[in-house]
């Protein structure tokens, strides 16, 4: 990728989302997402199965004891203090969403990155078109325009097989 970008004299920088979460770079956008929680839920929930609808939250808290990302429902919101409240193994926890104490579910995370990084253009495989549509609705709810998009066919490896992260090809 770098060779391609350099060849055509693109200006670019690579950013680690983990570092951006932990450094507080995403904090203002995370607060905005918390303030728009219900609207985001109204966008995402209809796209989920009945069981997943019961437990879904855009926020995935990081366990304060283990550092593991918890895929558990959020029971309460504290928008004033930028906190979420959730039950972890029978223990009610209140935790900040800021400074790397949470991550976001994929489609909300994508919209957050577009928003916080002022993304102008986004390429994605045709398998992500539905995700791009939902992320577009979310960024518009947050008050910004979505980036111009370009959907491409999936890439094939030298054997003509679909490139897959899980296969490692």
Locate the predicted segments by residue.
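N-terminal Rossmann-like or analogous alpha/beta NTP/dinucleotide-binding catalytic cores
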Residues: 1-41, 135-136, 142
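Alpha-helical recognition segments enriched in aromatics with Gly/Pro capping
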Residues: 36-39, 46-169
